[in-house]
């Protein structure tokens, strides 16, 4: 289908940060705007030099090597670490789309590069806009067959968390497996969900500072899922219509729905990326 990405993204509000912006400021900006990713641009020419995403924050909070900024450089002093410039944890190898790209190229990029959004740039690599999986799904909702069900699109290999798991352990699981969200399960039943966006909400608000007394990051990374998980989870079931689930994602601004049976036992998960496979 020949639709330019700019037709979808032309009126999108674009929020950026600079390489010198502090991690704390970037977190606050992401939280205030409810964005999961921010392009990092040079102040002088608006050229894209990086991107910071919710998964970079998960990595920073114990999920991977970016945690070294806290643990080693600042000896676990969280308050010092979040005042470092965002260039310390941003992704420099940015997957972008050119302004003349079509929607099929965007879908292929999301599916093959495992990214949920991409800055749109001109030939000089200057930022023009940004397009996400949700933008594409919203634009193509009417193209989904009313009778198509989700069963062939469900991701069946689901990794879960438990209510007693600590934030740092869940962060490691997310980064290791490249998953942005984990259903939280107790005695085989779904009781909540934790997402990479939740990390932004926690750290970009007053929660982290209210939760700390010494400034040591362990006061945050040792928090259990039962304290921070989202309990009111929107779910799907096998046999649900794909279009209905896509509409729920767009309307409720969520990236995935756990698929459960009548006893709330996990059967899989369906994500925005899974929905995009319909158009591939």
Curated annotation (Swiss-Prot):
Q: Does the keyword Ion transport apply?
A: no
Coiled-coil annotation reads none
Q: Tell me, what's a Pfam family for it?
A: CBS
Q: Which UniProt keywords apply?
A: CBS domain, Repeat
Q: Which domain of life is it from?
A: Archaea
Q: Extract the InterPro entries matched here.
A: CBS_dom (IPR000644), CBS_dom_sf (IPR046342), Diverse_CBS-Domain (IPR051257)
Q: What is this protein called?
A: Uncharacterized protein MJ1225
Whose protein is this, by species?
Answer: Methanocaldococcus jannaschii (strain ATCC 43067 / DSM 2661 / JAL-1 / JCM 10045 / NBRC 100440) (Methanococcus jannaschii)
């Amino acid at each position: 289908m020949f639709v330019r990405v700019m037709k979808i993204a032309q009126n999108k509000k674009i929020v950026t940060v600079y390489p010198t912006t502090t991690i704390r400021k970037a977190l606050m900006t992401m939280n205030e705007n409810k964005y999961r990713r921010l392009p990092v641009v040079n102040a002088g020419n608006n050229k894209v030099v990086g991107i910071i995403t919710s998964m970079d924050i998960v990595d920073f909070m114990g999920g991977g090597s970016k945690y070294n900024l806290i643990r080693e450089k600042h000896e676990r002093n969280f308050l010092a670490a979040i005042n470092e410039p965002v260039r310390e944890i941003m992704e420099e190898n940015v997957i972008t789309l050119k302004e003349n790209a079509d929607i099929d190229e965007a879908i292929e990029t999301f599916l093959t590069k495992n990214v949920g959004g991409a800055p749109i740039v001109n030939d000089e690599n200057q930022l023009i806009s940004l397009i996400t999986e949700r933008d594409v799904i919203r634009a193509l909702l009417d193209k989904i067959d009313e009778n198509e069900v989700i069963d062939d699109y469900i991701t069946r290999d689901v990794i879960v968390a438990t209510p007693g798991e600590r934030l740092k352990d869940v962060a490691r699981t997310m980064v290791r497996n490249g998953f942005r969200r984990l259903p939280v399960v107790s005695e085989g039943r779904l009781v909540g969900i934790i997402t990479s966006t939740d990390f932004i909400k926690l750290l970009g608000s007053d929660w982290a500072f209210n939760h700390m007394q010494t400034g040591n990051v362990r006061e945050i990374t040792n928090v259990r899922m039962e304290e921070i998980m989202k309990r009111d989870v929107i779910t799907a079931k096998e046999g649900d219509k794909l279009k209905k689930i896509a509409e729920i994602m767009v309307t409720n601004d969520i990236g995935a729905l756990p698929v459960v049976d009548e006893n709330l036992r996990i059967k899989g998960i369906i994500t925005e990326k899974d929905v995009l496979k319909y158009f591939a």
